[in-house]
Amino acid sequence: GGSGVTQSGRFLAYSTDTTGDERYTLRIKDLATGELLEDTIEGISSGLTWCGEEYLFYQRVDDAWRPDSVWRHKVGTQVTDDVRVFYEPDERFWGGGSSDRMEKFLYIESGSKLSSEIWVLECDNPTGEFRCLRTREAEVEYDVTYAEVGGEPRWLVLHNAHGPNFELGECPLGPLPDDLDYLRVLVPHRDTVRLNAVGAWARY
């Protein structure tokens, strides 16, 4: 399964599968007291993402074990009160959630083997509406990472619009351009080197 600790270190959320059917049960533990909270969410995918101390995002699966939806849970409330924040009806696509290292944004990625689409929400507004950065395009995959460049907030955008080995560009926060040629290129596509991922740190 998956696991995650809140930034303060107080709560641990973890998911387990004891039958092998890849449908997980999520529990939350208070690490300060050792107490298991009553919150129990059954029949979900393995992934989970914290947003502050109060909210947890997780994925549910359909009958074919495809993660098709992302849900928001408030710690200490009934599972029946959980809110579905994203649904992917296209059976070719799988949905998943994450947050960046700085916990600035929550991300929902819906991806297939050949294309992807990303939705974002500020972590300080966990009950807000996710926004699509760029609608899916056939045979184009992209990923984004939040970074501060020269003190300015930016998106680092990894995409394969210009070739199968991917290219790295950057742009201001907000929706991505439909034409990715408008990104400022940081690392161009190369035939001999493939870019798999990007991470941002203060000096790198």
Model-derived features: where do they sit?
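Multi-bladed beta-propeller domains
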Residues: 1, 19-21, 29-46, 73-94, ...
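Conserved beta-propeller blade repeats
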Residues: 1-15, 42-59, 90-109, 137-158, ...
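Conserved Ser/Thr-centered positions that define the repeating blades of beta-propeller domains
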Residues: 6, 50, 73, 100, ...
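Structured loop/turn residues at beta-strand edges in well-structured enzyme cores
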Residues: 7, 65, 101, 128, ...
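A flexible loop/linker signature enriched in serine peptidases of the S9 family
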Residues: 16-25, 40-43, 59-69, 79, ...
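Generic structural signal for nonpolar/small residues that stabilize regular secondary structure
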Residues: 70, 106, 118-119, 130-133, ...
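Gly/Pro-rich turn-and-neighbor structural signature
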Residues: 99-127
